[in-house]
């Protein structure tokens, strides 16, 4: 991917003025030059151009707030005066793995008054026996060269690395180069996932309740069936008893009628 295209993607619908950090590592610099980077990036504090195939920084725009510049693993051999002209706030510069052969190529860096840390690992200039003493003498403002101070004491991390960009939102509502809208979207996604989990739990609870109700319903039906059977059985018994009672009543009535007839016959005999 070429550098222009990469910058366009990194903007993510932001304005250049809203960008504080820009990482363009491993993209392709056409003709070995910087492309697509303009002086509209007025608030840029960190720029990384590692292994992009740069031969020169002659097209670097003015970036008044840039503090850290990563240019390692390129093919830069000179033209560092451009850095002194366009980067007045630069504190950390990494030129490791470039084609810097002579101490004289570093002289333009004397004008970078804020420069505290310089890295030249893998550059041919480091092969000089008096390399460190010469560079510290040439650049008295330096605190650390290749991660060590003048007394060969290793630099603390806070000095080697640029402090993280403060997380205060800018005028566009962005934090650390990330759109506030993107953070909101992530929050919404998390809430949706929580809601889905809650709904699943509710569904499970409802299913359990339905199962319990079904079981209770079956028990009630069993009880009702038992009562009906018992009631039905009792009903049959009652009907049989009623039939027996009716038979007895009929027998009694017939017996009574027979006695009455007998008495009437006896009475007639007496009259005769």
From Swiss-Prot:
Sequence ranges assigned to domain LRRCT in this UniProt record: 123-161
**Where does the record place Basic and acidic residues bias?**
255-265
Describe, as the record does, how this protein assembles with itself and its partners. Answer: Interacts with histones H3 and H4. Interacts with KLF5; this interaction induces promoter region-specific histone incorporation and inhibition of histone acetylation by ANP32B.
Belongs to which family?
Answer: Belongs to the ANP32 family.
Regarding how it is modified after translation, the entry says:
Some glutamate residues are glycylated by TTLL8. This modification occurs exclusively on glutamate residues and results in a glycine chain on the gamma-carboxyl group.
Pfam families linked? LRR_9 (PF14580)
Q: Point out residues bearing the modification Phosphothreonine.
A: 265
Q: Which GO terms describe its biological process?
A: G1/S transition of mitotic cell cycle; inner ear development; negative regulation of apoptotic process; negative regulation of cell differentiation; nucleosome assembly; positive regulation of protein export from nucleus; roof of mouth development; vasculature development
What compartments host this protein? Nucleus
A GO molecular function for this record? RNA polymerase binding
PROSITE patterns given for it? LRR (PS51450)
Short motif Nuclear localization signal, span: 260-263
Presence of keyword Nucleus: yes
Q: What name has this protein been given in UniProt?
A: Acidic leucine-rich nuclear phosphoprotein 32 family member B
Q: Which InterPro entries match?
A: AN32 (IPR045081), Leu-rich_rpt (IPR001611), LRR_dom_sf (IPR032675), U2A'_phosphoprotein32A_C (IPR003603)
Q: Which UniProt keywords apply?
A: Chaperone, Leucine-rich repeat, Nucleus, Phosphoprotein, Repeat
Q: Which organism is it from?
A: Mus musculus
Task: Look up the record and report any one GO term of the cellular component aspect.
Answer: cytoplasm
